[in-house]
Amino acid sequence: MEGLKVTPLRGVYEEYGGKIVDFAGYELPTQFKGFLHEHHTVREKAGLFDVSHMGEAMVTGKDAGKFIQYLMTNDINVLKDNEVLYTFMCNEDGGVIDDLLVYKFAEDEFFLVINASNKDKDVKWIMDHKGDFDVEIVDVSDSIAQLAFQGPLAEEILQKIVDVDLQEIKFFKLKRDVLVDGKKCLVSRTGYTGEDGFEIYCKPEDAKELWHAILNAGKEEGAQPIGLGARDTLRFEASLLLYGNEMDETITPLEVGMGFFVKLKVEEDFIGKDALIKQKAEGVTRKLVGFELLDKGIPRHGYEVIKDGKVIGHVTTGYKSPTLNKAIGLALVEEQYSKIGTEFNIKVRKKKLKAVAIDKRFYTKKTKTK
């Protein structure tokens, strides 16, 4: 695929039967043995993902904490060393520039993990807002490879090849300089599947050996490589949002039910705070809802949501859920139609199929929260 970027793991995909697609400008595997098989593997056993296309940036210096707080909606002050925080980075109108993870190494040292499709935009946004803050910002994306190992058996398998007790790495905590198969890595108990698991950051030159080592360690348990197809169905079932679907620069965190990650009472100002305070006071005019399709069909991103002949919103993500075995979706609709139990139609091609609003927590997470 001419002109596309590759990750350090590009050479291993075909070994495992990977089918390659263009994703965010990268050659990446959409599936290996089939996305349904891979989806169930992560839900029941453990699966390994190449997520080296994600972006990473280091923010260091005397004002690092203050600067991060200025950029982010969540309360950075609560972060202790070696902890991870999920947050939004918004524009002045409260629209989402990106959702990202903030890793705190020390008071003057933070590590940001950003979405692949937003990598260049995010780094530019961060640098453009440096102002008088005493910080240094470095895009380290090309010097890091990232693997995600997810599923109920992930800890048991990974424990075989690491030099630390993984039970000591609690949910949304991290440990640096962990030896994984003898290679120095950063390991965090984080993920994007709704299952317990780890994200492993390593040197690009170590990625292939780590990939093989992890899959070999989990051979008896049935660990498998997982592609982008299952990554999306897994995150969707767990109601984890995807940038470009559930959020963008015109959608605020409050509209998609993510107010928990917007700390409007923090003393410090952050970009978009005033707009979000105003929106919270006035109330949102649209909301993200879960829905189940009652007629036969599959809802897809962009399909219109219709009530009494009027378009009231659009589907952000929809699938036939592999775990729940029914057609469900997320939709951004006018607020007055967001109540659970509300019936509406989804326009699937030329048909208007019946649907009903349901709780958007489709799947109960099995992450270790303590």
Curated annotation (Swiss-Prot):
Swiss-Prot/TrEMBL GO biological process terms: glycine decarboxylation via glycine cleavage system
Gene Ontology cellular-component terms listed: cytosol; glycine cleavage complex
Top-level division of the source organism's lineage: Bacteria
Record key words, sorted: Aminotransferase, Transferase
UniProt EC number: 2.1.2.10
The keyword Transferase belongs to this UniProt entry's keyword annotation: yes
InterPro entries: GCS_T (IPR006223), GCS_T_bac (IPR022903), GCST_C (IPR013977), GCV_T_N (IPR006222), GcvT/YgfZ/DmdA (IPR028896), GcvT/YgfZ_C (IPR029043), TrmE/GcvT_dom1 (IPR027266)
Keyword S-adenosyl-L-methionine: no
Annotated family: Belongs to the GcvT family.
Subunit structure: The glycine cleavage system is composed of four proteins: P, T, L and H.
Protein name from the UniProt record: Aminomethyltransferase
Species of the source: Clostridium botulinum (strain Kyoto / Type A2)
Gene designation per UniProt: gcvT
